[in-house]
């Protein structure tokens, strides 16, 4: 449902911004061989893992156990933040690669090579980026939460 192929078909079936339950039911289902289906399922599971790992890093997650900047020992806050920013970039790059791979496979399965591109833009990936300003806000929020007893 989150592939470029489903977005393409949904835009054809319902060119407005909203979709009815019947629109989703009208989506065509391609005959994908078992091996290809397993590959798509496995890489989709990895994409879900990456997104969950990212989500757990935020205070609004029910699995949140602390901010990464304070969980590892570094000789400076900058080095801790740099490690976090590098991890965010690795996750982002892996997710972009996975999403492009899934799109490429589905475009091929539906024979839409002439209509769609599997290129995934950075802005399309909803995952944390290493942002000094936002990460400072998160660190302060976490510190205040600790002082107020939120994490004890």
Task: Please annotate each region the language model reported.
Residues 1-26, 35-36, 42, 46-50:
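Basic, amphipathic alpha-helical recognition segments used for DNA target recognition
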